[in-house]
């Protein structure tokens, strides 16, 4: 339990669902990546909590979809009541990892980055944290992409050698190829 709770809505209906319980500015007309103060209202119109609503319009959001994040007071009662109100108004609870899955399916993360999110959450040491964060930011993906491109370049040079086989020419540097294979093995 913390001082602040964050409740995230993502998907096509997130603005409609949120606006049924949020009193303040109309969220769907606000600019992306903005915060808006307002209240969450109980069904009878009584204020449950004062919140900040963060607006993240797709595709420029974590999931690639429209996203609203309510930052509320961290009371378990308040968080549970807000969740219940959202569920009654058309939301459903996300499955574990669903937001990251949506980000992956919408091309916001590659598989390595999506796996790194779970690693980051589960990290128990500074080293695990650093590695997972590096991977999540695309470090491993960039390295794999770089090595893949080098392999494709070598394959093209070897094809040239095969095409000009009778002329006894070497286009591909065998030492560099062995070095690249060593780099791949050490990953």
Segments (PLM) and residue ranges:
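A glycine-rich (often HGG/GG-containing) alpha/beta subdomain
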Residues: 1-130, 134, 138
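C-terminal-of-GTPase-core extension/linker across diverse P-loop GTPases
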Residues: 38, 128-187
């Amino acid at each position: 339990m913390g001082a602040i709770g964050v409740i995230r809505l993502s998907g096509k209906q997130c603005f409609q669902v949120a606006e049924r319980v949020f009193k303040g500015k109309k969220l769907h007309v606000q600019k992306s990546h903005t915060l808006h103060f307002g209240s969450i209202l109980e069904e009878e119109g009584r204020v449950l909590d004062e919140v900040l609503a963060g607006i993240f319009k797709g595709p420029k959001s974590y999931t690639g979809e429209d996203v609203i994040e309510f930052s509320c007071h961290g009371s378990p009662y308040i968080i549970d009541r807000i969740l219940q109100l959202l569920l009654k108004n058309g939301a459903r609870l996300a499955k574990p990892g669903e937001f990251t899955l949506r980000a992956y399916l919408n091309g916001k993360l590659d598989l390595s980055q999506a796996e790194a999110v779970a690693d980051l959450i589960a990290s128990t040491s500074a080293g695990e944290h650093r590695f997972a964060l590096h991977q999540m930011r695309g470090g491993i993906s960039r390295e794999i992409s770089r090595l893949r491109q080098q392999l494709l370049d070598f394959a093209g040079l070897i094809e040239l050698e095969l095409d000009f086989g009778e002329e006894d020419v070497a286009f591909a540097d065998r030492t560099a190829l062995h070095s690249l294979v060593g780099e791949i093995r050490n990953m």
